[in-house]
Structures are given as structure tokens and as C-alpha cells.
Amino acid sequence: MDVKENGNTWETEVDELDIFLGQNYIVTHHDYPITAIEETWEACNRDPRNTQNGADHLLYKITDRLVAEYMPTVEKIDAAIDQIEDQVFDRPSPRTLEKLFVLKRVLLAMRRILLPQREVLNKLARDDYRVIDPKDRIFFRDIYDHLVRLHDLNESLRDLVSGALDTYLSVINNRMNEVMKTLTIITTLFMPLTFLTGFFGMNFFEPLGLMKAWTTTPVFYVVLAINILMPIGMYIWMRRRMWL
């Protein structure tokens, strides 16, 4: 399994490898070049002694290299999660959420690969097979332990992604609450002003008698003072109530 980061997405490449093990032979089948197979082949060509311990030991060499290739992938994902965790607090965006879901999908794909491999290695390390030398079981046991640790790392990374997702949603909700709070305060401060300006701005009738006093200069200044002092008073009152 190989994972490559391409912008905001991750491309997961999974190549199927079939291995047939016999008493004195080992056959591998794969559609694309696999680094672990090529490295083992080159090692056997450089030093023929690598083939003298039996086909089962050669299987161990191949499997060990295959499992070792998971670590760079795990490190890539771990580094990506650290970067996203910083983005969650500094500049969360829909793109951040997309990255979290992509990483979660990649980790789920890795888990589906690790679990069957772990079971196979557990059988090779514990069960009796004619094609497996008992002295080589300890090597397969070592690979099984590596797969167990990789599975645990995978679970830890999935927990980190889930935690980052929860944190992202909390940050977005808090920001939304702050926006709604600000808009509510602005609306509350200007509501009395809207009422006063609307009431004194009505032109439905001509002022007569005592109502003529409403259009005098002193009334204008009184209303203007109320329009200025009322928002200030409401602001001070909200501050004392610790609403701001």
C-alpha cells in the first residue's frame, strides 16, 4: 500500500500480491512492480546464501520488507494530521474538513489491509505447516508483532482524526455563536433608535394643537440625545452583565 498526497486529496495505491510457498520453492504473482520483491531478488543475486535457508525464510525476507514499507505511509499521515490540527485552530475552512475526511478514509483502507495480514502472520507464527521450518516461526512472530504495532498506530491515528474533527466542529460552532452574538447585540442597540426615528418620522397627519410641540427644535435635540445616550447606556449595561 502506498499513499501519495496530491493537493487536498490523497491517492491510495494498493497492489495485490499472491505468494505460493512450497517445500523448496516460492512463487509470487503481481501485476505491477513491488519494491519488496525487487529488493529481495537483488539481495539473492548479490549473495546466494540468502537462498540457502529455505523457501520459508525467503518468504520471511519478502514479508518483512512488505511490512516495513507501511512505516513511511504512517509517518506521512501522522505529519498531515499534525498540520491539520494547527489549521483547525488557526484558519479552519471547508477545505480542512475535506482533508480530515480524506485521511479518515485512507486510515480505514489501511486497517482493512492490516487486519487480514495480521491474521495470516499469526497462523504462520503459531500453526504447524510442513513448508514452514519450526525455527523460522520466531521470524514470522516478529513480523506479526510489527503488524500489531502498525494496527495500534492506525487506531491511534484514527482517534486523532476523530478528535480533530470534533475540535473543528466545536471551533466552527463557537465562531458561529460569536457572529450571532455580535449581530444580536447590534440589532438590540439599534432597535430603540429604529423605533424613535420611525415614530417621529411618520407623515400621516399635520400636527395640530398640542402636537405642534413635537416638531419644535427642543424636541429634536431631546430625541437626538436619546438616540445617542440610549445605545451607550445599553452598551454599558451589557458590559456590566458580562454579555460583551
Q: Language-model segments: which ranges?
A:
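Hydrophobic alpha-helical transmembrane segments and their immediately adjacent juxtamembrane loops
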Residues: 145-244
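Peripheral, non-transmembrane regulatory/ligand-interaction domains of membrane transport proteins
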Residues: 1-142, 146-151, 156, 214, ...
